[in-house]
Amino acid sequence: MPAEWEPHRATWISWPHHEPDWPGKLGPIPWVYAEIARVIADHETVEILCASDEIRASACEILDAHGVGRDRVRLHIVPTDRVWLRDSAPTGVLDESGDLVLLNWAFNAWAKYDNWAHDAKIGEAIAAIASCRRVEPARADGGGRIVLEGGGIEVNGNGLMLVTEEWLLSDVQVRNPGLTRADYERLFTEWLGIRQTIWLGEGCVGDDTHGHIDDVARFVDRHTVVLAVESDPRDENHARSMDNLRRLERVSRAPGIGPLRLATLPFPRAVMMNGERLPASYANFYIANGVVLVPTFNDPNDRVALNTIAELLPSHRVVGIHSVDLVWGLGTLHCLTQQEPRSRLVVSG
């Protein structure tokens, strides 16, 4: 599985339409999406799923009003339930010849929600649109397809992976009943080419996926992990982020893993809505070709996060995307995007 900073052919997003994901706040969300599309389209193709003809027409109006050039934006009619393509879209990997293969994991709405029939078919639609080979990973014990979400896996493109125990080993929102730590490590090796899996503890507070890695720890190159750390001991994220830091420090020089360089990002102050703590995290950035989109929250730490990411990814432009409204949907930039890696297949003529 290529790292996120490796070349993309395109970024896939799904146009927002499901009002219950942003109760009372759906209005501004399409305009945030237009800005995301504008920034990414300056660097690579943006493929947009629209749940209906009506939604496609509305998306076109908003994109045009926002000045989004249409030469690198394509819109497709594909029914969806929600917009979080990081989890419902397939994972792009390269086979031995360098050709792109889409791993179409089973999707069950994070073992939490009951409306996911359309999202479970997104992988088939994307594979057809992109004319890519699709494979459906299955359990070794014959128990059916593997349930996995892209927001739960983070790779360095060289055989290392970050995941959390909260996501896969907890008895809450169980994705694959009966699978053990060793089972997961074997399937990561088989399907994603992983040599070593680094297990962190918990994700961030407010994450309805129950422990996705992309809100807490990310690779920015093959040898560097950036971790979201809460320094205030009174904050709910403090203990869990310090535990994750200790785990990373322990493995940073372990054989087959290290040396790893560790960097940290702060969290913004708690973002609340109707008394609910939302999963606001700067770690939910998205790396496209030559640009990094970073969620911002009208917080003094926005500047710290933007500067830190700029230092860690000096060859990329860094663009902040206002995400206070977006995170009311319980996700931000990484959650809503899915990269399509560029094939390395060389066709001899």
Give residue ranges: language-model regions.
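The feature marks the mature, well-folded catalytic cores of soluble enzymes
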Residues: M1-G349
